[in-house]
Amino acid sequence: IEAVSSAIKMTRAGLGNTDKPIGSFLFTGPTGVGKTELARQLAFTLGIDLIRFDMSEYMERHAVSRLIGAPPGYVGFEQGGLLTDAVTKKPHAVLLLDEIEKAHPEIFNILLQVMDHGSLTDNNGRVADFRNIILIMTTNAGARATQSHALGFAKATVSQDNSEEIKRAFSPEFRNRLDATVQFTALDEDIVLRVVDKFLMQLEEQLHEKKVDIHFTNALRKHLAKDGFDPLMGARPMARMIQDTIRKALADELLFGKLKNGGTVHVDYSESEQKVVFDVQLPRKKETEKVDALV
């Protein structure tokens, strides 16, 4: 976060390189630790668009033409490229290239031009301006080194092995044009609790639209943080756990149960019963309804 924010502050202060994107970053680390989420939150905080490409869709050599447009005489020449058109329409954005290691090596050659000169020419000769783009690429390369040394090895050894995998996956000219390679490590206990609060806050906002107030106990939060987090899989299993234990039960109450007209729910975790328990309270009737009932 500090590396990304420093690049943005230098650009806002007029001290950045005006011929390059605001920043070019490679996020590395295991799955489910927040690499993609950081890009989303960065775009949200800055109030700019997020342009996301899943690079697993660009594993073939001909996929390059989808990004910059097909050459003359080929199908799709009139349509232009997905990448160049997206940046032309939204010149101030966070460009997220997810799982970049899965892309064809030819795509890396295109990114060299973007990172070095802040521009890219499409099939029609139009130049897309990347100078106001924050380029973020994510990769799981190096995650195996982190997992294999999860027990009994020093952090320096893990970091060294991680760097070696990055060097094998990406060419020197590609790595040399990056502003920073940001290594994400496994989430600690405090961060996991914050992730729990984030997921529960999302659920609270969704239920608020249904006129339902929901409250969660600390026992539930600690239970989700302990049993819903997997060091190898990250925070994604926690979302599935919340869906299986809380969301499904609330869905039945919203559609067929006590919460059809709103209400209040208290969600707790019972250590003795080893399960999530719900306390549903019906909504209070309005004063006007009470008056009508008396009449």
Language-model segments: what does each one mean?
Residues 1-295:
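AAA+ P-loop NTPase nucleotide-binding core of proteostasis motors
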